[in-house]
Amino acid sequence: MNAVEYQQAARRRTASERRRDLSHPDLARPDLVRPDLAVLADRPAAWVAHVPPIEEPAARRTGTGAPDMPLSKLAAAGQGEIGEPGVGEQGRSSAADGLRLLLARAHSLSAMLGESCAPSIHSLRATTERVAALARAGEFEELTSALGRLLPGLEAAVRTVPKESQADAYELTAMAYQACSAALMKLGEPLAAWVAADRAMAAAEQAGNLLLAAAGQYRLAAVFLDSGEYALADEIARTSLIALRGLAELGDPDALSLRGGLTLLRATVAARTDHPATAFGHLATARLIASRLAGRTANELPEFGAQYVALVEIAVSVDLGDADHALRAAAAVDTASMPAGRLARMLVDVARAYALRQEVDQATAALARAVDLEPAEARDGAFALIGELASMRTPPPRLLVALAAQVGALPP
């Protein structure tokens, strides 16, 4: 059973059950920020205009908070000719522009006017699976092209398919917009990612799929986290955990996975707002959830397990300024079977830990290995840290300057 089929098999919750979930006193408090209530109230996607502009992708913030050294100083050190400018930045920017344009197009209006044709559910399911895989792999140009073909068909399908297939069409729509949101966050486009996450939650609600709606909540919380809106991220995660409690207590693997991911997100928020006891408390809770999940497979977002808890512990320790704990935690992780992208993200955090100790050579070596393993996953983290490392030593090491050129951190 693939991810789409599992989600569809798990979806059926009656309208009264959904109303009961939403009637929890914590969910009904008027003072809480509740983006899902905006969906239920049928508020337009233009509500994102109330978010303050983000000046810099959060993925590019450094671990220590020190300002980046002007990258022109790297070139002035006599090393500016080493290597070629980073090859990925232009492609990533064009992909971001493409995804933003897709969200701006009036697919739903065209479908309402009968100007779009709906492919079969089987065809839509296959394309949605491919879109989800492209988003996970970071193949943003292909993802943009695939979504450009998929979204008009999905918007037409939810309006034209027989009633018995409507829930399937809405679920596929939710999954497609979730993939779009995840990609936009990786590309440093938080406001567009918010729009996509909002549409994903609206579609999941129409489908009656609690788990898919919760996955949309997780995606929205991640948008706020990466945008530095920590109070909003934590509130979404906290109230989503309340809603998922019943299913998780029954041992549903998807509910456990979502609770684990949301708990790790709260740990990250606590670390970035300088609450170490709270952060490590959430990590302890996440370990318990991972032990309950054990080896069972969960198909919902996010991926979760004991290894993810260990990786977040490293990042949390760096965010709290505890480089020694971060490096001890990293040394205890079994990386033998770890996917390249995940290992690259861990190595960026290891480099951040070494930077806290001002160990430039070790940090540079970790960054270089991360970029070699998975350039798309490591580039932003490396870009953010290079200037900080360069400011620690004059002139900067040759390997660091070469790495700067590789990731596009030198002026052309």
Role assignments for model-derived ranges:
Residues 90-122:
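Basic/polar, acidic-poor N-terminal "presequence/leader" segments
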Residues 115-412:
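Conserved binding/catalytic microenvironments
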Residues 1-102, 359-412:
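C-terminal non-catalytic interaction modules
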